[in-house]
Design a protein with these regions (language model features):
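Short S/T/G/P-rich N-terminal loop/turn motif that feeds into the first structured element of a domain
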Residues: 1-34, 38-40, 44-50, 89-94
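Short beta-strand-to-loop capping motifs
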Residues: 8-10, 54-59
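An amphipathic, aromatic/His-enriched active-site/gating alpha helix that lines ligand/cofactor pockets
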Residues: 58-88
Length: 94
């Protein structure tokens, strides 16, 4: 399983339509589920370096990147994926 965090930044278009953002977030969770991605949490982070963070788990990187391409095509957000490792996974790496 691949764990990670998707960092989300609103575009100008996304900022103009911010009131629709919670509905878009719910729709994005449904889109993720269709691709086999479990959304563990979705946090808005106003005032932070990013506008939101989505904690996910998936079978591999391909569905994650497909999800990001699909969601970003709306023009409301830009996304970056950061792989996350458990303590046990980190122990194996070091």
């Amino acid at each position: 399983m691949v764990n990670g965090v998707i960092l989300v930044d609103l575009t100008d278009q996304g900022r103009r339509t911010i009131k629709e953002s919670p509905d878009r977030a719910e729709a994005s969770k449904a889109e993720a589920a269709k691709l086999g991605i479990q959304v563990k949490n979705l946090f808005y982070t106003p005032g932070g370096p990013h506008d939101a963070a989505i904690v996910i788990e998936a079978e591999g990187p391909e569905p994650i990147h497909k999800f990001m391409v699909n969601i970003q095509s709306s023009g409301n957000v830009k996304m970056k994926f950061v792989r996350a490792f458990s303590i046990e996974e980190m122990r194996k790496m070091i």
